[in-house]
Amino acid sequence: MVAIRLLQLLLAALLLSGCTFFFDVQDSVQPDPEPDSRQQKIIFDRIQQITQSMKEVTRSEVSNVGPNEARSGPEKWTVCSRGNSGNEVRYFTFFLKGETVANWRPAVINDKCETRSFSPFERDR
């Protein structure tokens, strides 16, 4: 009886560890390289569209592509944007997947947007 319980426990542990291994391998097989210059132009154009649609945010600027410092999502790369909202400066984080903006939100401290360099949006980026 003890041998059967031990085998059941061993089988359950083996099956559960296999699931974790499978997902780790899948993530490492599909790397997400930093977007190239063509992809960055598409990304910056999309971010500019999004920031221009924000009624209360003016004079938006954008950072270069950087790592996802907060690691708050599966995306490896981010771009920060900042703009004036009344008397405040607001920061936003845009999460990138290839040449698309997968998601965005108001920046949090862990995004480290305040430490990035910003420049105005340019048509020739």
Put a short name on every predicted segment.
Residues 1-19:
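Sec-dependent bacterial lipoprotein signal peptides
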Residues 20-125:
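Cystatin/cathelin-like cysteine-protease inhibitor module
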